């Protein structure tokens, strides 16, 4: 929904068709967390909600980013109406341009990584961290910040060691 590739009615139709074809499979979709709040009709056909949370893109300072993530999660849980919510993507870039109070840096990326993983472990929230490696191919579309979300760089070197 976020990118506008598909309208909600078509996505709902695809989910319904999948549920008929594979009835024992938990079915849902992945999108930005607020899209599930905006489209309750989409939530109704999902068994599970997979939401992307990026406090960086919303300009949160790294010291407040974990609390911001928790608020995003609560908004999504409310929209999910009892369905399981999995954080499908979250992360922090290590370089690039600031987004309001959000500053990309190796230190900030590690702070966010540690804080979000501690919180998710303590709360029993499933979380996928984005990303394992930098994606240098993204520089054309998203600049330095878009290619710099990895825990390791493009040469498989752990960023915090260098």
Q: Where do the language-model regions lie?
A:
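Generic structural signal for well-ordered alpha-helices
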Residues: 8-19, 69-77, 113-117
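Acidic (Asp/Glu)-rich catalytic clusters
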Residues: 20, 40-45, 78-81, 121
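Aromatic- and acid-rich polysaccharide-binding/catalytic face
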Residues: 31-68
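Conserved, mostly hydrophobic/aromatic
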Residues: 49, 87-89, 127
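Aromatic-rich peripheral "rim/lid" segments of glycoside hydrolase catalytic domains that contact
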Residues: 98-106, 119-162
